[in-house]
């Protein structure tokens, strides 16, 4: 059965034929962040794929991760293409390096997952929160239920983590 829902007025549909994403969003629907772990080399991977990008082995299992990490990079959207996002501009899309598997299998490798910046209750972040988050900010995952058995993973500032004094942000022109 496909996973269907609605996120900010947009229809979300993950068909069973897309086994990897169906499983990923199904775990998110249980409010668990899980990633694939290769049955051969043992390395974890995200986003979900049909084979390990490190050794090409196809078999994997889904393992839980902490859901905590550091902003590795970000994009700040000021002119939304999707009409539904216009009322939320500026908003951020964060690329977060998870705490697990840093610098593996080689230096500068890691588990990195993209998602929007949100408030702790799963709403898109207001402009004042967007302006405070930059590279180095510590975040944790939150889930926004969008349908039966499906949730959208989002990032929010981890209030329990030590934060950088001034996270790096792109210079304002």
Predicted regions and their residues:
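A broadly conserved sequence feature marking short terminus-proximal activation segments
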Residues: 1-34, 133, 147
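Short, cysteine/histidine-rich loop/knuckle motifs that typically chelate Zn2+
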Residues: 37-40, 54-57
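Glycine-rich active-site loops that engage anionic ligands at enzyme catalytic sites
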Residues: 72-130
């Amino acid at each position: 059965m496909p996973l269907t829902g609605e996120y900010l007025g947009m229809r979300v549909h993950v068909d069973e034929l897309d086994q990897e994403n169906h499983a990923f969003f199904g775990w998110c629907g249980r409010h668990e962040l899980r990633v694939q772990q290769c049955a051969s080399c043992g390395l974890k991977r995200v986003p979900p794929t049909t084979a390990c990008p490190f050794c090409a082995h196809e078999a994997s299992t889904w393992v839980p991760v902490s859901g905590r990490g550091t902003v590795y990079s970000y994009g700040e959207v000021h002119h939304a293409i999707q009409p539904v996002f216009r009322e939320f501009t500026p908003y951020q899309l964060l690329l977060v390096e998870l705490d697990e598997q840093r610098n593996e299998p080689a230096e500068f490798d890691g588990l990195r997952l993209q998602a929007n910046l949100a408030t702790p209750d799963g709403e898109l972040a207001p402009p004042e929160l967007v302006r405070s988050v930059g590279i180095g900010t510590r975040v944790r995952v939150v889930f926004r239920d969008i349908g039966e058995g499906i949730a959208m993973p989002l990032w929010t500032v981890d209030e329990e983590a030590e934060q950088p004094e001034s996270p790096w942000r792109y210079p304002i022109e």
